[in-house]
Amino acid sequence: MSWIEKILPKAKTTQKSSIPEGVWSKCSSCNAVLYKAELERQISVCPKCDHHMRISARKRIDSFLDHDNRMELGEEFEAQDILKFKDSKRYKDRLSAAQKNTGEKDALVVMKGELHGMPVVVAAFEFAFLGGSMASVVGARFVKGVEYCLEHNLPFICFSASGGARMQEALFSLMQMAKTSAALAKMSEKGLPYVSVLTDPTMGGVSASLAMLGDINVAEPKALIGFAGPRVIEQTVREKLPEGFQRSEFLLEKGAIDMIIDRREMKITLARMLGKFMGQTSVVS
């Protein structure tokens, strides 16, 4: 016990704190203490330092689409442990745990809806579900979204957040790279726009396929984008990587992506962009 604690009487509060749990949150970048309701209004972007925190697939879709006329696509697809895969834990058990923790059946949510009144289809990866890894259900849902666009002449937007292919599905997972790329080729043939939004992180097989095949490839600020991670590359080449390597600003400078958009401006910016692509310039004045 310190000397100051000995001479000062022990203070006791007569009233309990009126601040309920869950009111405050902390920025993982600048450590600022933030009012949670304000953070939610900012779509999990720190108002102090503009750090873009990771958000769930459904929160992203909710913040992006209009609230009316929504319809989920591909929700009938469910993961199967075809290979009976087991590492330190059975794949079946990993799936059950991920489903319980996230409330999702797999790592991609696809939704038909409206963007400032313009019909669109949006896909969003759920990174909390096994690292947003690409697997059979992810590929099937993605293709379902593309097919809906082809049938109804709609633009397609995908928000990527993934560590890459799901190793527990082996070649079934890798096959989704070709499957999704072939589906997007049909979009291109029909002249329908596909906008790819790369968020933190977009890595591995997802970055090597659907994430970089957009007619327009945009990214959120400071998103990690690449194939292998920076630590793996440094260990392989035995050299220190440049500052900001694999971050969206670095990729924009090198011409790998087209633009960087703040999450809070994503809806209005893409609405204007797609309005021009679809000949609906009156979507957003």
Swiss-Prot record:
Record GO cellular component, one term: acetate CoA-transferase complex
InterPro entries, alphabetized: AcCoA_carboxyl_beta (IPR034733), Acetyl_CoA_COase_Trfase_b_su (IPR000438), ClpP/crotonase-like_dom_sf (IPR029045), COA_CT_N (IPR011762), Znf-ACC (IPR041010)
Binding site for Zn(2+): 27, 30, 46, 49
Subcellular compartments: Cytoplasm
Zinc finger (C4-type): 27-49
Domain CoA carboxyltransferase N-terminal: 23-285
Record keyword Nucleotide-binding present: yes
Cofactor(s) of this protein: Zn(2+)
Alphabetical GO biological process terms: fatty acid biosynthetic process; malonyl-CoA biosynthetic process
GO MF term set: acetyl-CoA carboxylase activity; ATP binding; carboxyl- or carbamoyltransferase activity; zinc ion binding
Domain of life: Bacteria
Pfam families reported for this sequence: Carboxyl_trans (PF01039), Zn_ribbon_ACC (PF17848)
EC number annotated for this UniProt entry: 2.1.3.15
Family statement drawn from the similarity comment of this UniProt entry: Belongs to the AccD/PCCB family.
Identification of the protein by name: Acetyl-coenzyme A carboxylase carboxyl transferase subunit beta
